[in-house]
């Protein structure tokens, strides 16, 4: 594992390529009366939880109250009303809360309308949710011509240095890079002390793995019997929150966890949290649902710890597949790939294209490179069909975006398409990435809450703080 330290200031082009500029956003509402900005999913969650609490009070069920600091200033809000709800409504609310992270902006707006949710501080319904990008934007340099952002994660710096990291590792796979540093997110509603802040410390590992062979991990046997408490996406989509405690080998075998490498890191995360003193009865691994999945993730699990604020996401473990390396390679032209020497050469039969460069350039003039790139990008099945039409008609037509009407005709004197054999001594592939991401502040907060308590002194008048925090 290679440690890297990357800059916090990131050019906008990097984050545009990675998808963060367009997709790294939360849904927010605005109170038209006092101008308060509200995060939409938190608003829906708080309103429904308040109504369920009022229902329990109306039914005579004891509700545990979280102790509040009397010195802390709080916004004036209406007290919870003890109103008994119909059993069907209670079930609806519970199902919504179970999959609250899966709703998009339009669906959150529909929930607010349907259940007549109003801001408790003003009694007014907030505006429809709109997307709000969570990155802090700035300008780089005195001319301010280069836009940039404070990094929302440390991962992009690691991906940009992939080629150097691979060289440092003597071109050997698999390997990993790691980075510890500050990340910055312009949270809509920071709250709960260290749990939701705009500047925080995180530690991320990017483990690069060969996708061929099902993403096996050579040390999976060491952790296969570690039992994890899992809340999968199917359970959440059914509006339920019951969990299953299963050994990680079984979760991988039945497809709940996608592959061995992802399973290996989930088990290692569990063992780490156990070692530092996290209460094992207050930990679960929750799988992301489709709508809450990050734009770069193929699968993702969160290690959530239970606190007085509820279940808090403290560690994320995502299968980023080959997304990041692929998009950065496409944008920059840099080959972010691994070349592996084959033990035995292999013979490949394929359709190959030859262009007459002396005629091709003058014929297409300024569009020559664009057309050539489109031709080279043609898949094998398309090449086979075009070879047939070229032989039959003496010309072919291909789609080329940005040239004329999007259709380009190429005659047989400019192009040859033939089926040939070639021998390969090396294999090229883009590695997949498994990423464990640790929120240091959240882990420390949960650790203190899990290990710190007070007990009465001999006199009975004073309380003494006791901590069972471990030092690994």
What are these regions (language model features)?
Residues 1-472:
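TRNA-recognition modules of translation machinery and tRNA-sensing kinases, especially anticodon-binding
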């Amino acid at each position: 594992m290679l440690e890297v330290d990357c800059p916090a200031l990131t050019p906008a082009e990097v984050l545009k390529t990675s998808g963060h500029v367009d997709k790294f956003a939360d849904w927010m509402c605005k109170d038209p009366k006092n101008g308060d900005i509200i995060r939409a999913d938190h608003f829906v969650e708080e309103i429904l939880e308040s109504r369920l609490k009022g229902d329990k009070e109306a039914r005579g069920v004891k509700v545990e109250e979280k102790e509040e600091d009397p010195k802390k200033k709080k916004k004036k809000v209406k007290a919870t009303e003890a109103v008994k709800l119909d059993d069907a409504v209670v079930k609806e609310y519970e199902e919504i809360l179970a999959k609250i992270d899966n709703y998009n902006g339009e669906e959150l707006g529909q929930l607010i309308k349907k259940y007549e949710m109003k801001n408790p501080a003003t009694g007014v319904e907030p505006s429809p949710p709109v997307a709000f990008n969570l990155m802090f934007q700035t300008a780089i340099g005195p001319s301010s011509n280069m836009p940039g952002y404070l990094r929302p994660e440390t991962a992009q710096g690691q991906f940009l240095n992939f080629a150097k990291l691979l060289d440092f590792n003597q071109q050997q796979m698999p390997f990993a890079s790691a980075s510890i540093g500050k990340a910055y997110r312009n949270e809509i509603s920071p709250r709960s002390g260290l749990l939701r802040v705009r500047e925080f410390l995180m530690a991320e590992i990017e483990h690069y793995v060969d996708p061929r062979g099902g993403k096996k991990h050579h040390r999976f046997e060491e952790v296969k019997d570690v039992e994890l408490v899992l809340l999968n996406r199917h359970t959440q989509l059914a509006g339920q929150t019951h969990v299953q405690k299963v050994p990680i080998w079984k979760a991988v075998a039945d497809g709940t966890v996608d592959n061995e490498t992802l399973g290996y890191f989930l088990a290692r995360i569990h063992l780490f949290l156990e070692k530092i003193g996290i209460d094992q009865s207050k930990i679960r691994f929750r799988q992301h649902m489709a709508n809450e999945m990050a734009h770069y993730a193929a699968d993702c699990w969160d290690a959530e710890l239970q606190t007085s604020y509820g279940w808090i996401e403290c560690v994320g473990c995502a299968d980023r597949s080959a997304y990041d390396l692929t998009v950065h390679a496409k944008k920059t032209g840099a080959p972010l790939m691994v070349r592996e020497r084959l033990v035995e050469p292999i013979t490949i039969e394929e359709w190959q294209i030859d262009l007459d460069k002396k005629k091709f350039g003058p014929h297409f003039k300024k569009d020559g490179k664009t057309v050539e790139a489109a031709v080279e990008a043609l898949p094998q099945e398309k090449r086979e069909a075009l070879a047939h039409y070229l032989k039959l008609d003496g010309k072919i037509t291909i789609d080329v975006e940005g040239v004329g009407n999007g259709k380009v005709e190429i005659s047989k004197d400019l192009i040859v398409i033939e089926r040939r054999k070639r021998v390969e001594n090396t294999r090229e592939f883009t590695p997949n990435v498994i990423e464990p991401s640790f929120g240091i502040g959240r882990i420390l907060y949960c650790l203190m809450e899990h290990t710190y308590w007070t007990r009465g002194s001999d006199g009975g008048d004073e309380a003494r703080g006791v901590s069972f925090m471990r030092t690994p």
